[in-house]
Amino acid sequence: MRRTRTLLLLALTAFSAVFTPSVSAAGWDDVYTSRLGASASYLEAKLALKTAELAYDGYAKAYIPTLSFSTTTNTALNIGSDGFSSGVLTPSLTLENILGSDLALKAPLMASSSSGTLGFGDPSLSLTRKLFVETVADRLDAEAAVFSAQAAVRNAEKAMSLALARDILNAKYYGSLLEENNKNLAILEKVRGATKDTIAIRELDKRILQAKKAILVATNALADVTDDVKLNIDALNSDVLGMRDTWTTPIDDIAPTSSLEIHALECSLEAAKRRQTFSILPYLPNPSVTASLSYNLDKNTLDWGFSFSLSYDAIDKGERALNAYKRQEYPQIIALKLESARKNLADGVRKIQENLELLKLDRQIQDLTIADAKDAADLMARLYSGGFISEENYVIAQIDLAVETINGQKIDFDILLQKLNLASYYGAGQ
């Protein structure tokens, strides 16, 4: 009976192993994309970018027409208790921002139930523009808005990639720290229980407290690690270490001199200078001028005309003076912002490079420290094998080597994070 039960259990176990779907660990791309999708600032930046691109396309792609349908109060589509009676629907094909003008083609479609007719009204072609236009400045402002929106998206992506890389490397480091110190604590406590020498006991107690502190620090740090990293740490760590060469390839000795933010300010400055040249415009009336051609279908004649529309405040409360003053001042303001942005870019790169130099020196020092610890551990191992030293001295030497090795790993991780941060200035990274 027991044999039958055992065979059944083995069969069920095999069945479960075959038919239980395997769950593959999520990699960098999966977690990174998931985090971006859950970031309100990133999603908002993407939306702002689409808005800015659409506004800019109004100038850059003026050749793309818009098609609209409209009615007026006098030509509304009328439907009553007797059904449809009459109405005029006017399709309009418009090209906007053609050298500051709008070109529109209209062909009214008229319907009447009383006469039972459906036909076209007189087609017309019109060209409308303001008397004074600033199309170039408007386009530069729209282009600046695109660059600014692109910068916001890029900054959100940069912050997310650096945060994820930091989470992964910290999780790996603190995981190793916790594992090593748990192992060290068990050995230290075992040796402590067998030690009689008072001075040695004091040193062991100190080491035990240090191990407990390291365990507490690592435990608290790992408690802050999110599940998306914690559950996939091995795959994520492998991805980060595998992609670091790709991410840091663009880094060279020549510091970047521009960025999306700087491009945006350069466009804004050029637009502001153009508006400054026409700072008198707020004081001038700016009528809309329309030139039109229409074809009279009944008379088979071509008619033309010009029209002007105007709205002008002869007396205001200072709005025009303020607008003119802004046109005078904005070039200087934007120029100062541009200078500051260039300085911030250079300073940002310089500070990261300085941090990298310090970390590289730390790593060289740590290499020497590890070499010393390894030599000491090897010596203690030989002395312990020969019975010349106590077990506690041997154990402490081995623990010192393990601790220094982990400290070296932490410096390596810090160097990688600084390189990823620097690479983002060169347009590298995710």
Region annotations inferred by a language model:
Residues 23-90, 143, 197-201, 205, ...:
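Bacterial Sec-pathway N-terminal export signals of envelope proteins
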Residues 1-9, 26, 30, 135, ...:
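Periplasmic alpha-helical coiled-coil/stalk elements that build and connect Gram-negative outer-membrane
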Residues 83-89, 117-123, 300-306:
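Residues that define the transmembrane beta-barrel architecture of outer-membrane proteins
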Residues 9-18:
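Bacterial N-terminal signal peptides
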Residues 73-77, 109-113, 131, 293-299, ...:
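Transmembrane beta-strands of outer-membrane beta-barrel pores
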Residues 323-329, 333-368:
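C-terminal structural cap/anchor segments
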Residues 36-41, 53-66, 91-119, 124-141, ...:
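A glycine-/polar-enriched beta->alpha junction
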